[in-house]
Amino acid sequence: MAEQVALSQTQTCGILWEELCQSYSFHQSDTHIFIIMGASGDLAKRNIYPTIWWLFQDGLLPKDTFIVGYTDSHFTVANIRKQSEPFFKSTPEEEPKLEEFFAHSSYMASQYDDVASYEHLNSGMNALHQGPQANCLFYLALLPSGYRTVTKNICDTCTSQTGWNRIIVEKPFGRDLQSSNQLSNHIASLFHEDQIYRIDHYLGKEVVQNLMVLRFVNRILGPIWNRDNIACMSFTFKEPFGTEGRWSYLSESGIIWEVMQNPLLQILCLVAMEKPISTNSDNIRDDKVRVLKCISKVQVSNVVLSQYMENPTEEGEATRGYPEDPRVPHGSTTDTFAAAVLYVENERWDGVPFILRCGKALNERKAEVRLQFRDVAGDIFRQQCKRNELVIRVQPNEAVYTKMMTKKPGMFFNPEESELDLTYGNRYKNVKFPDAYERLILDVFCGSQMHFVRSDELREAWRIFTPLLHHIEREKARPIPYVYGSRGPVEADELMKRVGFQYEGTYKWVNPHKL
């Protein structure tokens, strides 16, 4: 294997900048104004400000880019710097660059429903205008309840008259099909679809963005990517911690609403879609919508809902189950784990179960896609062989590996499980992977919507899950308990087994980068 030669930061950023200028309408001479609505919030300090800093540090932002924070809290730029800088991962040598970054930052404290405040914001934005035109990017780092008022005031008062205007909307995009449609219709009455960027940071993950290349560039995978060869698929999202500090967000509709309905379903689309006619954003999203239209509403009989309980053998947070969290209402039936089986009813995937699993307070942090292939006909090894699997690990330790059978070294003719492995940290030791938000925000500057959710995608996703969510809300059935730090409820394993997934538990992938 050829060794990867490390590029300097200047070389890497120079190459990327050249690609940006060739691929997109990316004008260095224009003034760009990045407005963060909700600048004092957790998302802004942990993700948005650090991301803008990394792009600024690497020279990937246009020269005249200004960051404007807007919130109803009485903060200053100094306050913003104090709370966000710990997430910058900066070094003492970068202090001059940091000073330059915050010199491009300003802050405004006012109410979100005060029209006069938006007029004042617009005056401040006009004062920053230094080029032939000004482009404005509004990031709504707000609770969804504030979207209507804020977008209306932005549209009426603050949009650029000489350049483009783009708006980033954070998930969740509604609570069900009706509320999502109402929100989409409201925003569509103010902005065109090519101005709206519905962001889900999982679509910016390196391995997720690699899915289309794996599928449509490698001839070895094309002929086997169908129901004739694949027995079932699982899409897994696991977190080792509970709801600590985030109860109010999760409690709305549970983990189906938070994780399964959007990030997992979006990854399913990339795995199941047909080959688009090009890498144009709308061509890709057209084929994602076609896949979603082939998925029927989730059947309650194909769903397991569960809620974590305390683990008396552990310490710390694990000793407190979800019902014991003082922020949780007594008798809450919110699910913290869910497993559901979907079917894509088309020629390629007819009969193949797509298993979606997500949960909190589990035994590990992991997000992955697992394709399990059909058994080999004519078994001559007396059922000693396990199914082949293609595993796409999104986090942690990004990897793509194929689990297959080989002869165990030694005197005897016995097969054992092994893998063909592309571990990103091992293969690309000298390559810096951009953060997911870094990729996506740069995409917004460039005008690329490939990795953002379109309104018709959103509508189809809610069509699939809304009946189930309404059933859960109506019935208020008590979820099945599982122990904090476990694999989840046994009933989820039984559901997977019932639809054809084979879990042997005899093999665990070892990250070679840590050996």
UniProtKB/Swiss-Prot annotation:
- Where is the major localization of this protein? cytoplasm
Q: Which UniProt keywords apply?
A: Acetylation, Carbohydrate metabolism, Cytoplasm, Glucose metabolism, Hydroxylation, Membrane, NADP, Oxidoreductase, Phosphoprotein
Question: What's a GO cellular component annotated to this UniProt protein?
Answer: membrane
Instruction: Give residues where N6-acetyllysine occurs.
Output: 89, 171, 403, 432, 497
**Sites where the protein binds D-glucose 6-phosphate:** 171, 201-205, 239, 258, 360, 365, 395
GO MF terms here are: glucose-6-phosphate dehydrogenase activity; NADP binding
- Asked whether the UniProt record includes Membrane among its keywords, one would answer yes
Where do the annotations place NADP(+) 1 binding? 38-45, 147, 171
Matching InterPro entries, A to Z? Answer: G6P_DH, G6P_DH_AS, G6P_DH_C, G6P_DH_NAD-bd, NAD(P)-bd_dom_sf
As for subcellular location, the record says: Cytoplasm, Cytosol; Membrane
One Pfam family in the UniProt entry = G6PD_N
* Residue numbers of Phosphothreonine PTMs: 10
Query: What EC numbers are recorded for this enzyme?
Result: 1.1.1.49
Q: How is it modified after translation?
A: Acetylated by ELP3 at Lys-403; acetylation inhibits its homodimerization and enzyme activity. Deacetylated by SIRT2 at Lys-403; deacetylation stimulates its enzyme activity.
Which positions bind NADP(+) 2? Answer: 357, 366, 370, 393, 401-403, 421-423, 487, 503, 509
* N6-(2-hydroxyisobutyryl)lysine: residues carrying this PTM: 171
Tell me the membrane topology, using the record's own terms. Answer: Peripheral membrane protein
Which reaction does this enzyme catalyse, per its entry? D-glucose 6-phosphate + NADP(+) = 6-phospho-D-glucono-1,5-lactone + NADPH + H(+)
Which positions carry Phosphoserine?
A: 8
- Binding partners and assembly: Homotetramer; dimer of dimers. Interacts with SIRT2; the interaction is enhanced by H(2)O(2) treatment. Forms a ternary complex with ALDOB and TP53; this interaction is direct. ALDOB stabilizes the complex inhibiting G6PD activity and keeping oxidative pentose phosphate metabolism in check.
Q: Which HAMAP family match?
A: G6PD (MF_00966)
What family is reported? Belongs to the glucose-6-phosphate dehydrogenase family.
Q: What is this protein called?
A: Glucose-6-phosphate 1-dehydrogenase
Task: Tell me which species this is from.
Answer: Bos indicus (Zebu)
**Corresponding gene?**
G6PD
